Amino acid sequence: MDMDNLTLRYFDAEMRYLREAGKEFAEAFPDRAALLNLDKPGAQDPYVERLFEGFAFLMGRLREKLDDDLPELTEGLVSLLWPHYLRTIPSLSIIELVPDLAQIKRSERIARGFEILSQPIGPQRTCCRYTTTQDVTLQPLALASVARDHEPDGRSLLRLRFARSESVPWAEIDLSRLPLYLNADAPLASALHQALTLNRQAMYVRVAGQSGRMPMDGYFAAKGFADEDRLWPKGDSAFSGYQLLLEYFTFREKFMFVTLCGLDQLVIEPNAPWFDLEVVLREPWPHAFDLSAEHIRLHAVPVINLFVLEADPLELDPLQTDYLLRPMRLQDGHLEIYSVDEVTASKEEQRLDYVPFSSFRHKGGMLRDEAPERYFHTRLKRAANGLHDTWLILGGEGFDEDRLLRPDKRLSLRLTGTHGQLPRKALQSTVLDTAVQLTQFGLRVRNLCAPTLPCYPPNRDRFHWRILSHLGSNFLPMLDSAEVLRGTLALYDWTGSELNRRRLAAIVEVSHHLVQRFEKGFLLRGVDIEITLDANGFAGEGDVSLFGEMLNRFFALYADVHLYTQLTLVLQPTGACLRWSENHSQRIPG
């Protein structure tokens, strides 16, 4: 059992106390200690040991309850205003969908939610189920090779060769936006991301059979920051900037995507089997990093360990409002409930829906007269076995009528589930290689990175009180000092990763000042933010650039609606500066 299990930790503490206190008691009162067999060395009496274990378990649970910082108060408020803080972050990975170029005849769109199965793992040989988090378009196209080279004037150059299917002409391939995944270790992937998105100076295309090359007006756009790129569902009342931070600290691979734009303007000979894209860089490419086709992949997409889950119908009890939910098939004990999506009852062929309490559409909310009479709320509690139990709390006038007048009534549930830590129980060797749905062409699946461990909301260090203090404040106090900014960002790091700690510790100084100017007859107000970073806390300049891009996007979302933001990073010890353009809010953050 993992020592991160609080119940086990309290149990062990109570057992240690009983044994240590028992020795002292035996020395002070040997006649009475003899009755409990405490005065003799060696093996303890098994009946006394059972008594101690039972007492230690009960007292451990009691101490855990005394130390839990009143979750009944804080969790209710947090779940209403910031529900993302009480949700598990399931296991994540990146998969590659490789179509058979001999069979695919046109561009094929794979919708979000495409299911992938792992190879059987665990004692019960369970196949973990993952689903894609965004749409992906499969093209009759392959990235045949990736290499580095030099221009005649010495500038670094990256060469990408794209090859088409022999049966599909270039005119039928959609080249307008090609997502590419940078499949490498963090230092190389970050350097490649920076080179393509920030250090690109010129782009050329060289078509097979032609001696010269054509200039191209294209670019690589950073991917992973848009609303459609979210890894897990976002509640209607949740602020998207918080999820951005959680995704950055939990699964940075998500931001290792770039979108190649501008290839659709090319005129390519129909019979040409391939063309080379040459990217000339403004800064020299690091000599320590070699490149191959394995480092840039087409048709990659993030996947998450979430799937539709069946649950037993819920029988109402006249004396009960809280119900422990159990999946229909527990398998080997690693199946957990991620969310309750729908609760319904039936009355004389009429469907009665329970609405989420956080939607404010129940009779205690704003639409008092028109609102439904039934609502539900969920709460996550850690069980004694270390897993997380989901409790369903029902309420409303209609619910009171159902349970008192019709106690035999059953509710139907629609759940979303996850396999918890099972994908990482097999020594991190879980392989995702099976597509559930059939396609009209051959499709090979493989995961490009190991599935991550799930991350659970922190339950210590007065976590809920800290986020209430942070989220109740506005934008500018967060920029008062480096310590405040570090503490704010640390609330979103649930992994305990040493690399994340080093990045946060690298924030040396934070300053800001308000600026205003007239532009086209309007008074513009903004805040100029300057953050000094210790470059030694990052895995190269590319890592710094991605961290800055994340902060730039977060500040733009979090700032007051009447303020624009502009971020500048100053790197120590070199003194180099990275400055982003102004971000003008177009809508109220949310």
Q: Predicted segment positions?
A:
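Short linear motifs embedded in intrinsically disordered, proline/glycine-rich low-complexity segments
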Residues: 1, 9-10, 17, 58-65, ...
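Mixed-charge (acidic/basic) macromolecular-recognition segments
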Residues: 1-32, 36, 228-268, 274-276, ...
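Extended assembly-interface regions of large multimeric machines
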Residues: 1-211, 217
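C-terminal domain/tail detector
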Residues: 31, 347-590
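Extracellular ectodomain segments of secreted/surface proteins
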Residues: 58-66, 84, 145-155, 161-174, ...
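Residues at beta-strand starts and edge strands
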Residues: 89-93, 154-158, 174-176, 199, ...
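Short, aromatic- and glycine-rich surface loops/edge beta-strands on solvent-exposed regions
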Residues: 117, 272-282, 409-417
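Short, low-complexity Pro/Thr/Gly
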Residues: 161, 167-371
